[in-house]
Design a protein with these regions (language model features):
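An intracellular "coupling" helix at the cytosolic face of ABC transporter transmembrane type-1 domains
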Residues: 44-45, 137-138, 154-163, 167, ...
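Transmembrane helix-loop-helix hairpins at lipid-water interfaces of multipass membrane proteins
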Residues: 47-105, 185-190, 288, 301-305
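Helix-loop-helix
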Residues: 78-79, 183-197, 267, 271-340, ...
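Juxtamembrane helix-loop junctions of ABC transporter transmembrane domains
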Residues: 21-29, 52-53, 60-73, 98-145, ...
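Membrane-integrated ABC transporters
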Residues: 1-61, 76-91, 109-113, 117, ...
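ABC-type nucleotide-binding domain
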Residues: 354-355, 361-615
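Transmembrane helices of ABC transporter permease
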Residues: 46-56, 165-219, 290-303, 320
């Protein structure tokens, strides 16, 4: 991967890099700015109004030192000469009015920016979540769930901090700096130029801080993502962790990642610890120098005491915003690194895109055809060298073969989780790439060996593919797969909560609920990918009758290492190395001397010692 070929850095390719080529860093920052501008665009009018509000707020703030100058120079002398406090009272009232305007406009500004910031975060979360769901399995195969969680939590939180307080501080600081500089020169050019003399050094110091913090906060976002990734994966696989006594090793890994995250934050804190006191030091030295120089000018009669007092107040206002800017850099660099990652995710495109003009499939029949299909995964190794296959509508086909033979890949192509590298996969004569997502997911349903259940009731999980299904339809589907008895025996029946990942149910019960879910969806093509692998032999036999009901009048692809499941199929395809080496009805293949016959004999030998289970 070369640093100058920017095509290699699209999407999430730069996520794990601490330091990037300057050209790539520029492109990532530009991509992040485009995302931020896109999020801010709907609020253009509100932002313009808020800029006007903050201008008024800063004008009121800047007016107070000038009013102090007027009070000292024009309000106090008349009182000492016996003319009364009229001028001073007027100035005091003006100061109070300016303070009231400052408070009111500040309240409006903070209230509106808080609401706009939350609306933007709402849209960003929605957009990122929706995009993650649209991305193809090929992306999720290499992008861990921990990284997904990190994008939607810590990265969003970093952007939230910038929107809620960062922009407020930046806008206020910039307006204060510009306004103060103008007023310093207006009050006295000599003192003004002297006060602004350290500004070039301050800008150089700030530029150095920006460059260093950019690297540091990118590293911070990467390390916190790794901490979240390890935590999520460890908790998701907690049963395996405890079963293999991996707790000490996992703790060691987590401690190392956690230490890396701490070190990255410490480096950021060191930068802030250097920059913020440095700005204060420059500001205080400038105040001392102006006090000395201004006092000398005042003795010479070139400036009044009021002007000198206003100068000192303005200088405090002038250098305080530099500290605000330093804090904004802290927030912005963290948010900028988060924006880089989120914009990278949003730049990813599904490997299985939606067609521009989808072909409607009103009543799918389930005829599947592979025409010269070739397929390989990301490493380029052919999984299906060439596949020509026709499956008539309503036929159940069992795919048999050793691990890595290509069975699951073939099924995933039918479900269009992937697109072939060459050739076409057709459903009822229509290329799957021309079908809309809704039509395809209605026509083809996959039941996997993971039998994933979502938190909720059994009825909710059965309705997953058809949320509008009635209770009667849910019960009918559960009866069809032979699960009604066990569901009814549960304390809360169909309203029983399955727990996280269905953990309150046994593996066999989870599989039966997954079968019921598929049956209720009523697809034209049903794919069972190792769908009975979680059942023991007696349980598997009990489900055979229900399986025949499920497969009736629909096309089915059955992938199983257990050949008892294959016996209910109309046709068997034996695969090896991505090719079909045997094809025929199961009875005929069993009687032959091929691979399927050998597998069948081995299966009979493996269950010869098991007790009989009544049909």
């Amino acid at each position: 991967m070369t640093g100058t070929d920017t095509r290699n850095w699209r999407g999430v390719a730069a996520e794990d890099k601490d330091e990037l080529p300057e050209q790539v860093s520029f492109l990532l920052r530009a991509r992040s700015r485009r995302l931020l501008a896109d999020l801010l665009r709907p609020y253009r009018r509100e932002i313009i109004l808020l800029v006007a509000v903050i201008v008024v707020c800063n004008a009121a703030t800047l007016a107070i030192p000038y009013l102090v100058k007027v009070g000292i120079d024009a309000g106090i002398p008349p009182m000492t000469s016996g003319e009364g406090p009229g001028t001073l009272v007027t100035v005091v009232v003006a100061v109070l009015a300016a303070a009231a305007i400052q408070a009111a406009t500040r309240q409006v500004f903070l209230g509106k920016t808080g609401r706009i910031g939350q609306d933007i975060l709402l849209e960003l979360r929605r957009r990122v979540f929706a995009h993650f769901q649209r991305l193809s399995l090929s992306f999720h195969d290499g992008y861990t769930s921990g990284r997904v969680v990190s994008r939607l939590t810590s990265d969003i939180e970093a952007i939230s901090e910038m929107l809620e307080s960062g922009f407020d501080g930046l806008v206020t600081a910039v307006l204060t700096l510009v306004g103060t500089a103008v007023l310093l020169l207006f009050l006295n050019v000599k003192l003004g130029l002297a006060a602004l003399l350290p500004l070039p050094f301050l800008l150089l110091f700030t530029g150095w801080f920006r460059r260093q913090s950019s690297i540091t906060y990118r590293r911070t976002r990467e390390t916190v993502a790794l901490v979240i990734v390890h935590f999520v994966e460890s908790m998701t696989g907690i049963r395996a962790v405890q079963a293999f006594r991996r707790e000490p090793r996992n703790q060691e890994i987590f401690s190392r990642l956690n230490a890396d995250y701490r070190d990255a934050n410490v480096r950021g804190a060191h930068l802030i610890a250097l920059f913020t006191p440095g700005v204060k030091l420059i500001g205080n030295v400038t105040v001392a120098a102006i006090l000395l120089y201004g006092g000398w000018l005042a003795i010479g009669g070139e400036v009044t005491i009021g002007v000198l007092a206003a100068f000192l107040l303005y200088l405090r206002q002038f250098y305080e915003p530099m500290q605000e800017i330093s804090q904004f850099y802290n927030t912005f660099q963290s948010a900028g690194a988060a924006l880089e990652k989120l914009s990278g995710v949003l730049e990813e495109r599904p490997a299985v895109p939606e067609p521009r003009d989808p072909v409607p499939l009103e009543r799918p029949h389930g005829r599947v055809r592979f025409e010269a299909v070739e397929f390989s995964y990301l490493d380029g190794t052919p999984v299906l060298p060439r596949m020509d296959l026709t499956i008539p509508a309503g036929q159940s086909v069992a795919l048999v073969g050793t691990t890595g033979a290509g069975k699951t890949t073939l099924a995933k192509l039918v479900a269009r989780f992937y697109d072939p590298v060459a050739g076409r996969v057709l459903l009822d004569g229509v290329d799957l790439r021309d079908l809309g997502e809704r039509s395809l997911r209605t026509a083809v349903v996959l039941v996997t060996q993971e039998n994933f259940l979502f938190a909720g009731s059994i009825a909710d999980n059965v309705r997953f593919g058809r949320p509008d299904a009635t209770t009667a339809e849910v019960v009918e589907a559960v009866r069809a797969v032979g699960a009604h008895d066990f569901v009814s025996a549960l304390p809360e029946g169909y309203e029983t909560q399955v727990g996280k990942h269905g953990g309150r149910l046994s593996a066999g019960q989870r599989q039966l609920v997954a079968f019921a879910r598929a049956f209720l969806a009523d697809p034209a093509v049903l794919i069972l990918d190792e769908a009975t692998s979680s059942l023991d032999v007696p349980g598997e036999r009990l489900v055979q009758r229900a399986m025949r009901t499920i497969l009736a009048d629909r096309t089915a692809l059955i992938i199983a290492h257990r050949l008892s499941t294959v016996e209910i199929a109309d046709r068997v395809l034996v695969m090896d190395g991505g090719r079909i080496v045997e094809d025929g009805p199961p009875d005929r293949l069993i009687e032959g001397a091929g691979r399927f016959a050998g597998l069948h004999r081995a299966w009979l030998d493996s269950i010869s010692d098991l007790p009989n289970v009544p049909e």
